[in-house]
Amino acid sequence: MKKEPFVTKAQLDEIIKTYPTPFHLYDEKGIRDNAKAVKEAFSWNPGFREYFAVKATPNPYILKILQEYDMGCDCSSYTELMLSKSCGFDGKHIMFSSNDTPAEEFAYADKLGAIINLDDFTHIDFLEKTIGHIPETISCRYNPGGVFELSNGIMDNPGDSKYGMTKDQLIEAFKILKSKGAKYFGVHAFLASNTVTNEYYPKLAGELFELIVELKEKTGCDIKFVNRSEERRVGKECRSRWSPYH
């Protein structure tokens, strides 16, 4: 497919007469068309929600556009949580996934009612000590270890990653969280970056659904959603994080 710039050289020449360079110029129509296409593609699933990675483009105007299509915010820092709140996103539209998380960030995420995604097994006790309870809805990040391989070769090496919980840790984490008051559970995974093949998505979804069946059998937890995460880059600029089965 041939890609055409959304703006012409003549239009750019006119724009710079008013706005000095450098500046960012966004294609609002393209953003809206893509947001609409994603929403329509998964309309068969009434529980679907796309969560946009705020760190990719922390621009309130763009977030407000995506909000019109019922998208949520994927946040990884206090600042991103603040930005999401200022744009009017409520807790169920905010997914908080972070690493080496300071206490004040967990506390603020809980205050907003955001869905907290725990990256590490030790975060269970830390979260409880920080906010005084375990939220009714909680998510955990899964790391299967080994390598993540598609038909065209190895995509990434989760076994070398310090992020996420092993299957055994995840099972134990769900049991502990349930005993501490959690009622609804989610599973998050981010196994490869810069994927350019459609094979990645169904393969990851299949692995996660099989995992959920096992988690349900071994913990009895009510697993409400899967947060399937992915990062793409186009010219090192654009990144999007997907949650197609939330």
Which stretches of residues belong to each language-model region?
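Positively charged, low-complexity/disordered segments
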Residues: 235-246
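Active-site loop/helix belt of alpha/beta enzymes
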Residues: 144-236
